[in-house]
Amino acid sequence: IYGLDADLIMLTINHLPIAKNLFLFRETPHFIRSIDKTLDPNSLYMLRIPDLAQAIINKLNNGNKITKRQEKNRLYDYIFMTFLLGNDFIPHFPALNIRTYGMDHLIDAYAATLGNTDKNITDGKTIYWSNLRLLINNLQENEQKFIEMEYERRNRQAKRQFPNNTKEERDERFQSIPIIERKVELYINPYEDFWQERYYKQLFNIEPTENNIKKICINFLEALEWTFKYYSHKCPDWRWCYKYNYPPLLQDLIRYIPYFETHFIREAVKNPVDK
């Protein structure tokens, strides 16, 4: 499979049950150089998806042996967890940045909560919300620490000089705007008291009342279910969308994740193009 879409790894893993020998080809010289400086970044490399899948299973399951069915479910869980890192439909959590340690935080939390059990977030058909609660609870306990880590990393990056004399320098400066323009982020400041309130006031333009935060959290749970169905079945509702540019905080989301099986999205009858 060849393509530049960021979610191709998840899509190829999702198709392993029906295609055992999948390889992903991408031109990623910067990535190749970052993992091994002895490799030629201009050579062609392919990612063997079955080997990647087995490595993921071993990591999530703490190396324990499990049934083939459970292995498949572990991969479904991995795909589901990546939704928390953001995609075309959902923004990522400030505590979980895929460019830094977001994936590591997810895998560590999963291994600590579900890795030694036979529980799953999903079996590819159903979301088991009570099991998702276990994962999110672990993450929310470390949320402030993770956000502070990101804050410090961005402080270090912001100290870099970004000249703009040449076109190349101006392009790099443009790409670095999230590091340069940080007024809102610095105002929120996770090291200062009541930063959670400032998070909602600044990024959502709302008063952080319980009712307002609940609406955001429910909409985010809808987003998880909608994206899950979009990946595993079909688009459940062509008119649905996540209404905000940012996610709720994990410490708030945990309060609205159900302990039982339920649905937040009802499948709509309408087609993509209404007649």
Give the positions of each predicted feature.
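Long, low-complexity, charge-dense
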Residues: I1-K275
